[in-house]
């Protein structure tokens, strides 16, 4: 909205042109989302308590997690509402990439909300059935990725970018693009959901990765930087840094209340949505492989569950004391805050490695 106002008001006073600057709007979006989240946090937490939207039991975790029972959940609504308001205020609403991100955000918010609501209403940790949840996620993802494919104006928008060689860019067919893109979004959504098992464990990696993807968006939107790094130049991709800024601001604000010991949990409405947002950003920017490096912690959490289930099914033996893997370390005697901070550190290192690959071409 402010970008449009800047365009209209610049004829009255050239000073209003500042509202069109990408850096100004990114900072504005970040600060707005941060302040909204911190200001609305206590009000939402009180409302969740009044509505009895509380963690009634431990879905996945050691016995020690029973003390967390009664903590308000569905705090992801705080993140999403601040993200949406800030994005609508500061982003260029004429940019189709922004609308794809907003569509994914709203679609997965509905799925996550219903999942949380059913768990609370029926006091059943299953919520939406696995098949229905996966089907819903797939429908939303396929819709978004199909839109990206059919509105692409350049082959770079539908190409797979590999690492270490500037010539390893391959245009994808319609089917492969839609299937691969949907897999990334759905997989990312569920990976973040699995990671969200300790206080603050999922939100800071989401913030850091959002920052990393925002830098890539800015680089791809700037012709000089894109040419220097030998990555495709997508002019309208730069606008995504404003959305990433809003994501970072709302995430930091939520961490204020979600850090150990948590006053509120994000619930599936938060984790499923945040994972999908990171996934769709990676798909839009065509840097899914770089994102996979950044999201190494999320992938490790997912693989630990897959390995555990497969091993028990075929060998009747468990590889880990408990999956996802953060619970394994809990049962090994690691204090919860130490696990959280170490996973944060690993994520930061992986993001630096991932960003370094952009120069190694």
Residue positions per predicted region:
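Hydrophobic alpha-helical transmembrane segments of multi-pass inner membrane proteins, especially
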Residues: 141-145
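Select subsegments of transmembrane alpha-helices in polytopic membrane proteins
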Residues: 68-80, 132-140, 336-346
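Alpha-helical transmembrane segments
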Residues: 2-43, 83-96, 100-110, 148-150, ...
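Alpha-helical transmembrane segments within multi-pass membrane transporters and channels
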Residues: 110-117
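Membrane-interface helix-loop junction between the first two transmembrane segments
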Residues: 42-60
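Membrane interface segments of multi-pass transport proteins and intramembrane proteases
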Residues: 119-129, 160-172
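Juxtamembrane helix-capping/reentrant segments at transmembrane boundaries
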Residues: 57-71, 125-136, 326, 331
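Divalent metal-coordination and catalytic microenvironments
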Residues: 75, 116, 268
């Amino acid at each position: 909205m402010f970008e449009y106002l800047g365009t209209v008001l610049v004829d009255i006073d050239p000073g209003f042109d500042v509202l069109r600057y990408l850096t100004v709007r990114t900072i504005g979006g970040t600060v707005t989302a941060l302040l909204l989240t911190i200001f609305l946090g206590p009000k939402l937490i009180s409302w969740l308590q009044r509505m009895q939207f509380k963690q009634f039991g431990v879905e996945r975790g050691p016995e020690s997690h029973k003390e967390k029972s009664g903590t308000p959940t569905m705090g992801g609504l705080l993140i999403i509402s601040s993200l949406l308001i800030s994005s609508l205020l500061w982003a260029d609403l004429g940019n189709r990439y922004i609308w794809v991100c907003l569509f994914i955000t709203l679609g997965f918010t509905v799925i996550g909300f219903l999942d949380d609501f059913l768990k609370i209403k029926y006091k059943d940790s299953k919520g939406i059935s696995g098949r229905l949840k996966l089907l819903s996620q797939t429908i939303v993802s396929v819709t978004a990725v199909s839109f990206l494919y059919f509105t692409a104006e350049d082959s770079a928008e539908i190409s797979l970018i590999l690492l270490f060689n500037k010539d390893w860019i391959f245009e994808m067919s319609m089917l492969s693009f839609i299937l691969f893109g949907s897999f990334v979004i759905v997989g990312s959504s569920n990976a973040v959901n699995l990671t969200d098992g300790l206080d603050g464990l999922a939100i800071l990696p989401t913030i850091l990765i959002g920052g990393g993807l925002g830098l890539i968006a800015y680089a791809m939107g700037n012709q000089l930087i894109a040419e220097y790094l030998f990555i495709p130049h997508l002019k309208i991709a730069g606008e995504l840094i404003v959305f990433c800024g809003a994501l970072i601001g709302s995430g930091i604000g939520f961490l204020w209340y979600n850090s150990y010991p948590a006053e509120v949990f994000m619930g599936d409405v938060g984790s499923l949505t945040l994972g999908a947002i990171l996934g769709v950003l990676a798909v839009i920017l065509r840097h899914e492989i770089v994102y996979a490096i950044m999201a190494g912690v999320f992938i490790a959490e997912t693989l630990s569950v897959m390995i555990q289930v497969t091993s028990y099914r075929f060998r009747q033996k468990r590889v880990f004391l408990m999956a996802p893997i953060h619970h394994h370390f809990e049962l090994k005697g690691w204090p919860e805050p130490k696990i959280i901070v170490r996973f944060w550190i690993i994520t930061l290192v992986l993001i630096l490695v991932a960003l370094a690959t952009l120069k190694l071409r």
